[in-house]
Amino acid sequence: MAVSERRGLGRGSPAEWGQRLLLVLLLGGCSGRIHQLALTGEKRADIQLNSFGFYTNGSLEVELSVLRLGLREAEEKSLLVGFSLSRVRSGRVRSYSTRDFQDCPLQKNSSSFLVLFLINTKDLQVQVRKYGEQKTLFIFPGLLPEAPSKPGLPKPQATVPRKVDGGGTSAASKPKSTPAVIQGPSGKDKDLVLGLSHLNNSYNFSFHVVIGSQAEEGQYSLNFHNCNNSVPGKEHPFDITVMIREKNPDGFLSAAEMPLFKLYMVMSACFLAAGIFWVSILCRNTYSVFKIHWLMAALAFTKSISLLFHSINYYFINSQGHPIEGLAVMYYIAHLLKGALLFITIALIGSGWAFIKYVLSDKEKKVFGIVIPMQVLANVAYIIIESREEGASDYVLWKEILFLVDLICCGAILFPVVWSIRHLQDASGTDGKVAVNLAKLKLFRHYYVMVICYVYFTRIIAILLQVAVPFQWQWLYQLLVEGSTLAFFVLTGYKFQPTGNNPYLQLPQEDEEDVQMEQVMTDSGFREGLSKVNKTASGRELL
């Protein structure tokens, strides 16, 4: 069973579930770009530890503090375990879930960019093998010295020199890594050997990588492999604890995440301005305002607050490596409310609630009974994903749950719009109000197209963009999502603004006799020079 320091939900009573969800929210603030992953009883052959976009002079530090293989000493000496560091394409992380069980990544001779860290438990050393063009990718033993906490204090010296002969270790105390360099025929460093410590039936070592030039910049994926667990049914559980610290010259954020602080701050201001403008419209047209209009205002302000907290979180992650706990909790709460309000508002507008009717049908109530719990589940999945490490055993499961639930919600909110369109189509041919119903029908058809475009741009086009652009431009994915959301909000407000000439306010209130009398009076010229009075859905007259 794999466990992480950032736990999710488990079994228990509803009260315990609530407590654990709150615990997840609180611990979510601890996640950042300094990662600590602890797995016990793990049986996976390949563990995707993390991915990160590095610029020149960026650094990756890895400290394997615990590795217990759970086998006899003779069996451990023949194991094939280690790390791999590869440069992957933008928008994706290498997956080993479908590979052949006889194909071990640690035994590959690759012409592409790849670094292998082969753990040799027999000789107590870690052999580093490089493949591809890596002229300025520097690998050193130990961790980088920490910066002084106060100005004027001297920096602590590294406890391990970068190149030292020897590789033996002592089991009496925790020894330092002692690397050795083997020279190749050309005189260049071909294989770097790091010292491996063995203490209390556990192995440990550390290293750090520095990106030396622009040629080595890119999206890197760090993975752990235990090739002896590749054969199904013959897995042996092992324990591993690893610390990963990633940093770019300007902070702890990945290359694609650096612009997000400013992006989310600007978008938060845009949604705030849109919300204030919308409230001003409602205050000027109080006679035509429905409850759904105030719900739309609440959604705009909630979205703005959510983006504000998200922006602040990224600022502290970039400067400290982790966000502030209180702000992280506030962000998760705002995000949960925003997600629920968004789909509820879209579904209510699509059903025509308060616009063309005051009571939801049984079918529409069932849709809300599906969308609301699904949105709660989607937000719980999002919080768990944000608060757990990529290497956690259930990380991929929660990502799949989030994708599936979000897809179901996007499909479900279209049904009320379709039903409203059909209702107006049927009504236009039966109640004699063809002109009014056709105007409403056109309005809801436009809204249907808007919802389709919103889902298409934020779910499909955004993913394609993320795959297509280089690693440093991955933030365009968030720009497209937030920009599409803002455009959808503005267009929805424009289409359903509380003005007297809006089609949804022109609800027919007259019966058939009134229509006939109106026709007679018009034909006779009796009403010449008089203006027509329409009644709104609220029963109030608009001149």
Swiss-Prot record:
May play a role in intracellular immune modulation by activating NF-kappaB response and attenuating Toll-like-receptor response. (Microbial infection) Plays an essential function in adeno-associated virus (AAV) transduction across multiple serotypes except AAV5. May play a critical role in mediating the endosomal virus escape or in the AAV virions trafficking from endosomes to the nucleus. Its main location: Golgi. GO terms for cellular component: cis-Golgi network membrane; Golgi apparatus; Golgi membrane; membrane; trans-Golgi network. GO terms for biological process: defense response to virus; negative regulation of toll-like receptor signaling pathway; regulation of immune response; type I interferon-mediated signaling pathway. Belongs to the LU7TM family. Residues 1-32 form the signal peptide. The lineage of its organism: Eukaryota, Metazoa, Chordata, Craniata, Vertebrata. It comes from Homo sapiens. The chain crosses the membrane at residues 263-283, 292-312, 336-356, 367-387, 401-421, 449-469, 473-493. This is Protein GPR108. Residues 149-186 are annotated as: Disordered. (Microbial infection) N- and C-terminal domains are required for AAV transduction. Keywords: Glycoprotein, Golgi apparatus, Host-virus interaction, Membrane, Signal, Transmembrane, Transmembrane helix. It is a multi-pass membrane protein. Glycans are attached at N57, N109, N200, N204, N228, N534.
